[in-house]
């Protein structure tokens, strides 16, 4: 699932990201200062309104573009192109890093390519000589796996709809604990064993403890944005490696195709669970839990100013009970708030508004299944680099097209269908057509 979000300026001093950020109430002002500020604000507003009316009379369509006052024609398109290219880079880097970690592990650590077990969600084995029976077992495994995903997604949406936040946080914290401590311990142990690096258990436990503790703080509380993004990429790679190891070969490919179809239905259907989750979060003006979403920019959730198109560009601030208490001075008289005016063309506020960027949010499930596809291409079949690179390029092309559609439709879109479809097409075509062709050329010592 891929969505846009409002973000802070690139020049913002704060470099931390958190799901809960406190908003400070403005300092109470005296009655005289408030009245004086109100009079000054009214005079400035009248002067600006008269000036804008004169400009509007000269050219009515001068500063009207897509319903945004104070923005000349063509600027919206330029911003879309600018942010579109930036968003592509913002998502290409983490997706590429996640897939590189998975492929590098698959190519070097034999533990994740050895088949010595299956997940409980895929109980049917594929070790049968009959092709039909193997295909049937893979379809049955896919049905069970997709059913589990659907049930758990609906359960999560119901919990969020009825505001069971503590239960959801406990669920996510438990999952993060397993990934950051148990799976990291297994991963680090296998890597050290592969490269024949000796390490005593106290040092190993201390390393895993430090890694997991910092990750829990960054993901579920607050910390540097780059560090949180790195932890989200790492836990996605660890989860993808588990799927690559324990999913049967044919079942993995059928599951990838089925999960892309489910993602399409869950996000675009009016009653789809993921769409209901996003709409509920937007109605409540709340962020989706950071343990489920990778965000490319800072998220401000409390005290964040919101531009409401229905108010004709006026700056809307969320209601804060503390502000209501602070609006009265020590004598019990109300103090007059400052007057907020939208930035007009030619004023410094417009530059600040243009510098604001919108971030992109991509679900961690998309990272996981992207990496599963590339990792399976590297681990199964021939496992040559041509097939792996073809799947890698296909996923990036699909992600780029998805971002293009996101810029056009400006709503939450599924990120799996296009990328997974391209990846499957590139995998089977490269593995069955390109690889035999190149092997034949190499055997005859012909080079193109």
Curated annotation (Swiss-Prot):
SMART domains associated with the record? PSN
GO terms in the biological process aspect are: amyloid-beta formation; calcium ion homeostasis; intracellular signal transduction; membrane protein ectodomain proteolysis; mitochondrion-endoplasmic reticulum membrane tethering; Notch signaling pathway; protein processing; regulation of calcium import into the mitochondrion
> According to its UniProt record, where is this protein mainly located?
endoplasmic reticulum
Q: What class of enzyme is it?
A: hydrolase
The compartments listed are: Endoplasmic reticulum membrane; Golgi apparatus membrane
> Which Pfam families does the UniProt entry name for this protein?
Presenilin (PF01080)
An example of a GO molecular function for this protein is: aspartic endopeptidase activity, intramembrane cleaving
Which positions carry Phosphoserine? 22, 25, 30, 52
Highest taxon above the source species: Eukaryota
Where along the chain is composition biased (Polar residues)?
19-30
Gene Ontology annotations for the cellular component aspect, listed alphabetically: endoplasmic reticulum membrane; gamma-secretase complex; Golgi membrane
Give membrane topology per the record.
Multi-pass membrane protein
- Where are this protein's intramembrane segments? 414-434
Q: Which UniProt keywords apply?
A: Endoplasmic reticulum, Golgi apparatus, Hydrolase, Membrane, Notch signaling pathway, Phosphoprotein, Protease, Transmembrane, Transmembrane helix
What about PTM? Phosphorylated on serine residues.
Q: In which tissues is it expressed?
A: Detected in the embryonic brain in frontal cortex (at protein level). Expressed in the developing brain: frontal cortex, cerebellum, hippocampus, basal ganglia and brain stem. Localized mainly in neuronal cells and astrocytes.
- List the catalytic residues: 263, 366
Which residues are on the Cytoplasmic side of the membrane? 1-87, 160-166, 222-223, 271-361, 410-413, 435-448
Q: What is known of its domains?
A: The PAL motif is required for normal active site conformation.
Q: How does it assemble?
A: Homodimer. Component of the gamma-secretase complex, a complex composed of a presenilin homodimer (PSEN1 or PSEN2), nicastrin (NCSTN), APH1 (APH1A or APH1B) and PEN2. Such minimal complex is sufficient for secretase activity, although other components may exist. Interacts with DOCK3. Interacts with HERPUD1, FLNA, FLNB and PARL.
Q: What does this protein do?
A: Probable catalytic subunit of the gamma-secretase complex, an endoprotease complex that catalyzes the intramembrane cleavage of integral membrane proteins such as Notch receptors and APP (amyloid-beta precursor protein). Requires the other members of the gamma-secretase complex to have a protease activity. May play a role in intracellular signaling and gene expression or in linking chromatin to the nuclear membrane. May function in the cytoplasmic partitioning of proteins.
Protein name in the entry? Presenilin-2
């Amino acid at each position: 699932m891929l969505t846009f979000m409002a973000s802070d300026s690139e020049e913002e001093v704060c470099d931390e990201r958190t799901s809960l950020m406190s908003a400070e109430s403005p300092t109470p002002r005296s009655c005289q200062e408030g009245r004086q500020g109100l009079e000054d604000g009214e005079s400035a507003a009248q002067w600006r309104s008269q000036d804008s009316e004169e400009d509007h009379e000269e050219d009515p369509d001068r500063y009207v573009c897509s319903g945004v006052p104070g923005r000349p024609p063509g600027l919206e398109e330029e911003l879309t192109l600018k942010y579109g290219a930036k968003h592509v880079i913002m998502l290409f880097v983490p997706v590429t890093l996640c897939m590189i970690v998975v492929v590098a592990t698959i190519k070097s650590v034999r533990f994740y390519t050895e088949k010595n077990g299956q997940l409980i969600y895929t109980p049917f084995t594929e070790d049968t000589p009959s092709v039909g029976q193997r295909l049937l077992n893979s379809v049955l495994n896919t049905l069970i796996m997709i059913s589990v995903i659907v049930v758990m997604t609906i359960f999560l949406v119901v919990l969020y709809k009825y505001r069971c936040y503590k239960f959801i946080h406990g669920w996510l914290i438990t999952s993060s604990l397993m990934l950051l401590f148990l799976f990291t311990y297994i991963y680090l142990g296998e890597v050290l064993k592969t490269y024949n690096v000796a390490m005593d258990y106290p040092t190993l436990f201390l390393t895993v403890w430090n890694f997991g503790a910092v990750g829990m703080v960054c993901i579920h509380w607050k910390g540097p944005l780059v560090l949180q993004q790195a932890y989200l990429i790492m836990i996605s790679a660890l989860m993808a490696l588990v799927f690559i190891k324990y999913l049967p070969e044919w079942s993995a490919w059928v599951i990838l195709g089925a999960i892309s179809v489910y993602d399409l239905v869950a996000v675009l259907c009016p009653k789809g669970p993921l769409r209901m989750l996003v709409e509920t979060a937007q109605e409540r003006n709340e962020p989706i839990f950071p343990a489920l979403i990778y965000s490319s920019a800072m998220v401000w959730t409390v005290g964040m100013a919101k531009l409401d198109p229905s108010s004709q560009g006026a700056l809307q601030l969320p209601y804060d009970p503390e502000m209501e208490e602070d609006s009265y001075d020590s004598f019990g008289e109300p103090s007059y708030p400052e007057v907020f005016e939208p930035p007009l063309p030619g004023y410094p506020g417009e530059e600040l508004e243009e510098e604001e960027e919108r971030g992109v949010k991509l679900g961690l499930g998309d990272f996981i299944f992207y990496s599963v596809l590339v990792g399976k291409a590297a681990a199964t079949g021939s496992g040559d680099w041509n097939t792996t690179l073809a799947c890698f390029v296909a996923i990036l092309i699909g992600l780029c097209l998805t971002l293009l559609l996101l810029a056009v439709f400006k709503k939450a879109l599924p990120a799996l269908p296009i990328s997974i479809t391209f990846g499957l097409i590139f995998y089977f075509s490269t593995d069955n057509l390109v690889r035999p062709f190149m092997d034949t050329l190499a055997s005859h010592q012909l080079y193109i």
